[in-house]
Amino acid sequence: MDLKNLTQEERSELSLIDVAHFILEQRKETILFPELVKEIQAFLGLKDAEIRERLVQFYTDMNIDGNFISLGNNMWGLRAWYPMDAIDEEVQTQTTPKKKRKSDDDDDEEILDDDVDYDDEEIVEELGEEEITLADVLLDEDEDEDDHLPDGIEGDLATVEDDYTDGDYTEDPEDK
């Protein structure tokens, strides 16, 4: 079907898909989507606002229609141009083997050097020069310093009594 001979009124009745198919048949090569849209707009004589309104539906229709194929990077062509075997090959990308990275063995040795060897008596003596006696341990167990506040503060603290000691939690004690 030759769309070039149609009047402007007949062209306005065509769908964007039909015009896209016609343009791709005439060019006989792939085309970027924005370029295809510009050619459709020029062919149909549509304003920018009109083409923007129909653009989303047009893109959806191109994806659903079996006559078009997206070749990646927003390139479109006609599916009839490609045999089925070639389509799968063009869509697949070649994977390149990953480069081997040099291992960071030096870092591991530094970490191992930082570890304390408890079999070496000199290092252990340096780490624990303070001797702890049994009296120190018993003192720590019996008396926690956190339990006692400095003088003067304990007397300033008020004791809060629990008003809910009777087990009735439904009513506020201040309302009684």
Swiss-Prot record:
Composition-biased stretches (Acidic residues): 105-119, 159-176
Is tRNA processing set as a keyword in this record? Answer: no
A Gene Ontology annotation in the biological process aspect, one of them, is: regulation of DNA-templated transcription
Record region (Disordered): 91-119, 140-176
Where along the sequence do coiled-coil regions lie? Answer: none
Which family, according to UniProt? Belongs to the RpoE family.
| Name of the molecule in the record | Probable DNA-directed RNA polymerase subunit delta
Lineage of the species this protein comes from: Bacteria, Bacillati, Bacillota, Bacilli, Bacillales
